[in-house]
Design a protein with these regions (language model features):
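Primarily recognizes the serine-hydrolase "nucleophile elbow" in alpha/beta-hydrolase
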Residues: 107-154
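Short alpha-helix in the alpha/beta-hydrolase fold that links the catalytic acid
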Residues: 37-39, 170-180
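Alpha/beta-hydrolase-fold catalytic nucleophile elbow
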Residues: 54-55, 112, 136-139, 161, ...
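Short beta-strand/loop motif that positions the catalytic acidic residue
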Residues: 160-162, 166
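Short N-terminal helix/helix-N-cap motif within the alpha/beta-hydrolase-1
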Residues: 32-33, 146, 201
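Short, proline-enriched alpha-helix->beta-strand connector loops that line the catalytic pocket
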Residues: 107, 153-158, 184-187
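C-terminal catalytic histidine-bearing segment of alpha/beta-hydrolase fold enzymes
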Residues: 175-220
């Protein structure tokens, strides 16, 4: 298992020790330095939150400056399920390490993902021993849910946001994820940004902000 190192971060605006942690998981070929750009849009509403955006443990083979949670050599459902499963232990270990470091619990934690990072956030977040406060997923998809029917899993609230013009991850992925999460009894809210490609827009940022504030408050 590859270890995830500390990456980009934004300390609590309050200047005090963190009372919450928001972990942002970037997309394929990107890095935490890119996704941490979301944090300043939310920091004023979550002044006691520590924002962490670690790099994935693998260098991206096709984009030498970026990182990947796993290699996207195949895009069928079984390959995606295997990929998320292979990368999950490193993410879980990173989460556990940070919660222990700051004396916090899963209720104090929110996960945010973009694209491949959304796949990781959903995979790991649904399989924690205790529910995180919430999961926000931008422009991603849900993988490997069949196994959940045969084991215990947690049901944190989920927000999924997707652009209708996404050329990388088709918008149908959101609709499929919503259907599957509802079938599993996971509370899910979705939003489609009309005309948006593989990106996060101002509406998505605001929705993420509002969701995180409510989720972290209600989890305590």
């Amino acid at each position: 298992m590859s270890k995830i190192v500390n990456g980009a971060s934004l300390q609590p605006r309050s200047g005090l020790a963190p009372k919450q942690i928001v972990i942002l998981l970037h997309g394929y070929g990107s890095s935490g330095s890119d996704l941490i750009a979301l944090a300043p849009h939310w920091q004023d509403a979550l002044p006691d939150a520590l924002f962490l955006a670690p790099p994935a443990p693998q260098r991206c083979g096709t984009m030498s400056a970026g990182y990947q949670w796993w290699a996207l050599s195949e895009l069928n459902s079984s390959a995606l399920a295997a990929g998320t499963a292979s990368a999950a232990p490193a993410v879980t270990t990173f989460i556990d390490r940070k919660l222990e470091q700051y004396g916090l619990t899963d209720a104090d934690l929110a996960l945010v993902g973009f694209s491949q990072g959304t796949m990781m956030a959903l995979h790991v977040g649904l399989r924690r021993s205790r529910p995180v406060s919430g999961i926000v997923g931008y422009s991603g998809m849900l993988t490997a849910t069949t196994e959940l029917e045969h084991k215990d899993f947690v049901k944190p609230p989920v927000l999924l946001v997707h652009g209708t013009a996404d050329p990388v991850v088709p918008v149908a992925a959101l609709q499929s994820a919503e259907t599957e999460l509802k079938r599993l009894g996971v509370p899910v809210t979705t939003h489609l940004s009309d005309g948006l490609g593989h990106n996060v827009d101002a509406v998505g940022l605001q929705l993420g902000r509002d969701f995180l504030v409510e989720a972290l408050a209600q989890a305590r």
